[in-house]
A protein has these predicted regions:
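N-terminal amphipathic/hydrophobic targeting modules at extreme N-termini
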Residues: 7-8, 14-20, 26, 32, ...
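N-terminal low-complexity/intrinsically disordered extensions
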Residues: 24, 28, 64, 68-72
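N-terminal alpha/beta PP-like core and its mobile active-site loop of ThDP/TPP-dependent enzymes
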Residues: 69-365
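Compositionally biased low-complexity segments enriched in histidine and/or tyrosine
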Residues: 2-6
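Residues marking helix boundaries in flexible regions
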Residues: 20, 60-63, 69, 267
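Intrinsically disordered, low-complexity regions of eukaryotic proteins
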Residues: 15, 42, 53-55, 66, ...
Length: 365
């Protein structure tokens, strides 16, 4: 990566050997020291003009000590990958194209830290990122170029949206100066995906890129999880900007339940003779399988699940009635007709489950 390095400190600066020869390359090294220790920024010089100014460097090592912080000047593609590393990303899925070539150049340089899974088609890449998120509990990341590459992601993004899967889709686009001019392979992918994303961005300034990526990951994982799209014009991926590493923001806790609501639920559970518990995909996404098992045992309830909720409760348990709804089991249909209390956990009540609202769980509270 070609970057400029700036080391900031309110403490004493002691340059040591500003330039020295190392083989056929020059090594730049500055040390900054105080009572807390020494911070050293070391870099290869890849280009120096005749006046020895305005050079760019290849980072070898930066050691940060207490009292110091280091700001690197990276291009947009490198900032993007550094932000992915901040979020704990080590695997991305995608298919290359003209508008994301700078990102793929950076991926090659970061190949020891981030694994790229190449698919035959962008739609496959998006579904793979979605599946990766489901199986790993992490945020899926997919990369596609502008135009047809971006539109090929739509089905995968919509799937993640409907199933509440955390996904960050990164698309390239034409340079900022060509946006809105019907340029080659330009589409309004932000507008196209607006109905099937939690949020989306068009990053027109490289200085906004890092915080945009961080916010995208936060939104994808906060509350009801889902996909977020970041559209990055090609020139933004090449422009240089200062970058400072930041720790991910902690995800805010969910909705606070009022005491009177808890008391109402307890009263209903105590009164119930034939409780029925219906589990959905939220049980799996929140890793609440053990809590659900404990709850069911204490209530002595029978259990059914949605399609997304399968695996949230042990299907070999005698309390498990199978799936509920249009494609569910006869056992679950009979049990819900007979129950006197219906408890839904981590689910939405889709038309495939409710069918006819007037006859759904007719004897239940």
């Amino acid at each position: 990566m070609s970057v400029g390095v700036t080391v900031f400190s309110t403490l004493q600066e002691n340059p040591v050997n500003p330039f020295r020869t190392m083989g056929s390359k020059r090594l730049y090294s500055n040390q900054y020291s105080n009572q807390s220790g020494t911070a050293e920024a070391t870099a290869f010089v890849s280009f120096v003009n005749k006046e020895n100014e305005g050079f760019f460097v290849f980072i070898l090592n930066i050691t940060e000590k207490k009292g110091f912080y280091v700001v690197m000047k990276l291009n947009g593609s490198e900032i993007l990958l550094e932000c992915l590393l901040e979020q704990g990303v080590d695997t991305v899925f995608g298919y290359p194209g003209g508008s994301v070539l700078n990102i793929y150049d950076a991926l090659y340089k970061y190949s020891d830290k981030i694994t790229h899974i190449l698919t035959a088609h962008e739609q496959g890449a998006c579904h793979a990122a979605d599946g990766y998120a489901r199986s790993s509990g992490r945020t899926g990341v997919v990369i596609a170029t502008s135009g047809p590459g971006a539109t090929n992601l739509v089905t995968g993004i919509a799937t993640a949206y409907m199933d509440s899967i955390p996904l960050v889709a990164i698309t390239g686009n034409v340079p900022v100066s060509l946006l809105g001019l019907d340029s080659f392979q330009e589409v309004d992918i932000a507008g196209i995906t607006m109905p099937v994303t939690k949020h989306n961005y068009i990053v027109k300034d490289v200085r906004e890129l890092a915080d945009t990526v961080r916010e995208a990951f936060y939104i994808a994982n906060e509350g009801r999880k889902g996909p977020v799209l970041i559209d990055i014009p090609k020139d933004v991926t090449a422009n240089l900007c200062e970058y400072t590493k930041k720790e991910p923001e902690p995800i805010a806790s969910g909705k606070t339940i009022e005491a009177f609501e808890v008391n109402q639920a307890i009263a209903l559970l105590k009164k119930a003779k034939r409780p029925f518990v219906y589990t959905g995909g939220g049980v799996i996404l929140s890793d609440a399988q053990q809590e659900v098992k404990t709850f069911v045992e204490r209530c002595d309830a029978v259990v059914s699940s949605s399609l997304m909720g399968q695996g949230g409760f042990d299907n070999t348990d005698l309390r498990y009635m199978g799936m509920l709804g249009m494609h569910g089991s006869k056992t679950s249909s009979l049990a819900i007709t007979d129950c006197d209390l219906f408890v839904g956990i981590g689910t939405r009540f889709s038309d495939r489950v409710i069918c006819d609202i007037k006859s759904f769980a007719p004897n239940a509270d």
